[in-house]
C-alpha cells in the first residue's frame, strides 16, 4: 500500500530543513523508515509474501545509503535523525 498523502505530508513537515523541502536526505530517510515499518508489520501477518520482502530489502538498502551519506556530510544531524526515528537500538 502506498503512503497516504496526509501521512506523507506530516512526515515532510516534521523533518524538513527549510520551507518547501521535500527531497533532503532527512526527509527521504524518514519517508523510507515509515514505509519499512509498514512492510515490517505487513510481514507479521503475511509470512509468505516473498515478493514484497524483496522490495523491503531494497528499501532498507536505499535508506542505508542515505544514512551513510548523511553521516559523512553532517554527523550531528545524523545522530539527531536516528534518535528521532528510533532506528538504532
Swiss-Prot record:
GO molecular function: rRNA binding; structural constituent of ribosome
An annotated GO cellular component: cytosolic small ribosomal subunit
Keywords on record: Ribonucleoprotein, Ribosomal protein, RNA-binding, rRNA-binding
GO annotation, biological process: translation
Pfam families given in the database record: Ribosomal_S15 (PF00312)
Subunit structure: Part of the 30S ribosomal subunit. Forms a bridge to the 50S subunit in the 70S ribosome, contacting the 23S rRNA.
Function summary: One of the primary rRNA binding proteins, it binds directly to 16S rRNA where it helps nucleate assembly of the platform of the 30S subunit by binding and bridging several RNA helices of the 16S rRNA.
Family: Belongs to the universal ribosomal protein uS15 family.
Record-linked NCBIfam families: S15_bact (TIGR00952)
Family annotation (HAMAP family): Ribosomal_uS15_B (MF_01343_B)
Protein name in the entry: Small ribosomal subunit protein uS15
Organism, as annotated: Desulfotalea psychrophila (strain LSv54 / DSM 12343)
Amino acid at each position: 500500500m502506498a503512503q497516504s498523502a496526509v501521512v506523507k505530508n506530516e512526515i515532510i513537515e516534521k523533518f524538513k530543513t527549510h520551507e518547501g523541502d521535500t527531497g533532503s536526505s532527512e526527509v527521504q530517510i524518514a519517508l523510507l523508515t515509515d514505509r519499512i515499518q509498514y512492510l515490517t508489520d505487513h510481514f507479521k501477518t503475511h509470512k509468505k509474501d516473498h515478493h514484497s520482502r524483496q522490495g523491503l530489502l531494497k528499501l532498507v538498502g536505499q535508506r542505508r545509503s542515505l544514512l551513510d551519506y548523511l553521516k559523512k556530510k553532517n554527523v550531528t544531524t545524523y545522530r539527531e535523525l536516528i534518535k528521532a526515528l528510533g532506528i538504532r537500538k
